[in-house]
Each structure stands twice: as structure tokens, then as C-alpha cells.
């Protein structure tokens, strides 16, 4: 059993070391990162990858909806100012070193065999693999809902943590760059359900890391103020209501938890479409 666990640990470390080399060797001179301990290499890889993802996704998103599709998705008068977007970038950059510490810590725990994470499908079939992904996402959705709600309901937490994000409370101050503009501890608290779920549900290493980093794209999308009206997705239309009312639509991926716990508010456009269907 000890040998099996040691083999598992070695396999995971070899895999994460490969990811470190794959990212860092293309971005930095070898002499700057290779002497670092494995944990610091992992954090540096996550930090650089997180920044690249944030800027590329944010820039492309803004360029498309504010310039290429001007007045198509967002009215000209509702486009956030350059000053507002630069402030959001500044807040996100202050927090980024701390955000990217979380996946480094989760990888450390995975490498030491403390979680239910796995790196091969040797002991699972594809059906179980997808079932566990679904359970993982349900757990994450449930936990993020309650973390987010308590960040509003507990006044101390709101004042000292979550209020930083709610500086952006109007359509003309929200942009994709606001997606990661949090107090560092606030951002970590809302991402930590991904780590807690590792101890409850078996999940593939790549799936866990991919979902963590896809959060960057997801949070950009729900701050663009464009209501996609794709049921039951908690899109930007719902999240814009959250930023303006402060007491609705705490959910993350879907409207499920808000519907279950009575905090759902449907965007006006969707209400109108419902009325038309009833007629």
C-alpha cells in the first residue's frame, strides 16, 4: 500500500512538473525558475498563466463587445470608462499573487495524496468520470452560493472584503476586467469550494485545474452586462442584477441555488419573454 501511494505521489509530481516546464520554459529563462523549489515553480506557473488568461480574455472580450459590436450588445453610453477598467485591472493585479496561491496549495495537497484527486482513468470508467464531475460542480455551486451570500449578510465581511468588488455597481462601471477585481481574501474564499470538493469527490487533476482557471473566463463573461438568456445559466443579466440590488442572484454557474433558496430575480427581458409565451 505504501509503495502504491508513493507511486501515485511520484506520478502526480511528474505530471505537475511537466506543466511547470511547459509554461515556464516558454515564458522565462531557465536559470530564473529551474532552481526554485517545486512548490514555488507551481505558484509561478499559475501566476503567469493566470495573468495571461486575465489579460487576453479581458482584452478580446472588451474589444469585441465595445468596439467591433458597438451598440449591438452594449449601448455606447453604457460602455465603462477607460479609468474604470484600469482601476479594475489594478485591483485584480494586487490580488493575483494570492489568487494563484490557491491552486498551488491544492496541487501540493494532491501531490501528497491527501485528496480524492486522480490522474489516470485506470480505476474509473467514463460514466463514473462524468458523474463525479457533475457531483463536483453541484458541490462547488452549493458552497460558492453560501460563501457569496454570507459575504453580503455578514456586515463585517462585506465592509472589509466584498465591498471592494461592489464598487462596480452600475452597467457603465462593470466590464469583463471586473471579474477578478476582488479583495484577495474574498477571491480566495469564493474559489476555495473547488479545493474542499477535492476531499469529497474523486476528480481528475486536469479537470480540477481546468475548472479553476476557467473561473477567470467565466467571471469575465458574467460582468459584461450582456444577458444571454440561456436557461438555467447564471449569465451576466442575472449577475448585473446582483451588482445593483445586492440581495439577489448569488449563484455561480446556474440559477439553481437562488431558485431553491428564494433569492432569484429574473432579468426584465426574460420576464417579458415569459409574458409573451403565456399569451
UniProtKB/Swiss-Prot annotation:
It catalyses: a Delta(7)-sterol + 2 Fe(II)-[cytochrome b5] + O2 + 2 H(+) = a Delta(5),Delta(7)-sterol + 2 Fe(III)-[cytochrome b5] + 2 H2O. It is found in: Endoplasmic reticulum membrane. Its EC number is 1.14.19.20. This is Putative Delta(7)-sterol-C5(6)-desaturase 2. Residues 134-263 form the Fatty acid hydroxylase domain. One of its GO terms (cellular component) is endoplasmic reticulum membrane. A motif (Histidine box-2) lies at residues 162-166. It comes from the Eukaryota. InterPro entries: Fatty_acid_hydroxylase, Sterol_Desaturase_Related.
